[in-house]
Amino acid sequence: MNVAELQDVCKEYPSFRLNRVSFALEEGKITGFIGRNGAGKTTTIKSMLNLIHTSGGEIRYFGMPLAGHEKEIKQRIGYSTGTVSWYPRKTIREIVAVTKTFYPNWDEEAYRRYLAFFGLDESKKPIELSEGMKVKFNLLLALSHRAEVLILDEPTSGLDPFSRDELLDLFGELKAHGVTILFSTHITSDLEKCADNIVYISKGEIRAFRPREDFMRENGRPGETLEEIFLRLEKEARA
């Protein structure tokens, strides 16, 4: 079953166009979203969250159109980026006290568990956090209101290899509990470890949406890694 669907989503800028983007997120699966910088990954994600207005197409979650059901849908999804841009001089404790008032499903036990798991100090302020810890703070908020779908933009950015592996293990645990994850990243080696499906975007268009093993078999050469396949496809597209 699909818990999120994009159908012919378009967004036009003076120098860039998101062109009829279509793919779906399968329940309880991790979908890797790959593409070079400027390919349209972040524009697609912002469209999925209604942070920008699309020029056309439809986005649905849980069978409901995002247009007209945004408030209800956003109670059931979580979003994380590699940056923290709000309340930079408030403490984590103060930010959380405000944030949880917006989520009736806020799980204080889960919050405390992930706070310890990520090694975050509630007395710290976002401006005092490393880039890696900012990523963890975003994830902490997304995981603490029992989100059924996680939309993650570069969630392993700024993390050391050990922390990245810990996070990938966590994603596996969440998947086992039925959580659906969209994992947008340029670190394709992470996706080789955890992704069930791959969405490949180039120049604003979806070039492939396939199960990971099928994507690698259909586009790869013997012995190539996902990263090597991606790099070669990009070079061929520019040739």
Placement of each model-derived feature along the sequence:
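Helical segment within the ABC ATPase nucleotide-binding domain
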Residues: R164-H177
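Conserved ABC transporter NBD signature motif
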Residues: G57-G68, E72-I73
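ABC-family P-loop ATPase nucleotide-binding domains
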Residues: T81-N138
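ABC ATPase "signature
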Residues: F209-R210
